[in-house]
């Protein structure tokens, strides 16, 4: 298990390599939650993610012989960028395995940072499948595997985020009640928690997971890491089916509690951060800020620091994020409604069912021959989310057999 001293040693190596990212007071969030909120902006790191820290330090610690043979890694994106950047700087070969579901923006960034020293292999639908292929390749080629989280040197490198936070807080004359840390495989929180509990043991360390990928919560509940059969890959940077053995043992010892944050709330937060203060975060990076909403009643008057772990957001995903945010906020809803197959039925629906400022966002209709009614897939955006119950009452009067797709996970997921 790593110690705070290991993190100090890692910082000596990394201080001339990585950016000492900003620790900024956030006036908007502070006023919103009645607290003093600071943001550690790892989205401003050289590869727009904290992952450079662990990757660089782990590779730096290899022997010259191991460096010459080359390294292998598996990553959903950010760890791969850290490895690629490092190998380009050190002029050593790297083979990087990425899930086929990885956003194109992250794949392109890996190529950019790695240049001629990196070969990319897209394998598997999840990180875990990609990691298994990478492990097999490592053995067959006699190279060194750089684990994205379950490695003590990687954890020590990630822990330098906490080293900087504590150092910057002292310079500002600030002390924190709690620190909110995104959790995927556990590399960041294991490093952060190790250092924080050594230098500021009274500070609460809170891990934040996406609700659809709570692998650390599952490990806490079972007493050991377990593999989740299915995960929501929306927050891809923290969507991990199974946490590491080494990261779990550190988290179990030092992390005070874990929170789950709905992917819709993450989307809403990500959009809010961009529109209000111009901060660009990826879903995983926004998770810690989203968690403020979950604990808003208990943080009033307190001083909190949130780590924005990354800012590698694919602009092509914004429509999905907007959709998730609207659904989470209770604005957008989907239904299957049987419409009378006669002229004027749609006008009647709009006049009788929708409020004056409500909107139809989706309308798919297939006319049925020789039938009095035909099913319509309809999306409705409410002007006031509090009118939801009234909408359901009016829908029931229009079609008692209507289907609310919010209760049908399979169909609902096809739309979002």
Name the predicted role of every residue range.
Residues 1-416:
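PLP-dependent amino-acid enzyme catalytic core
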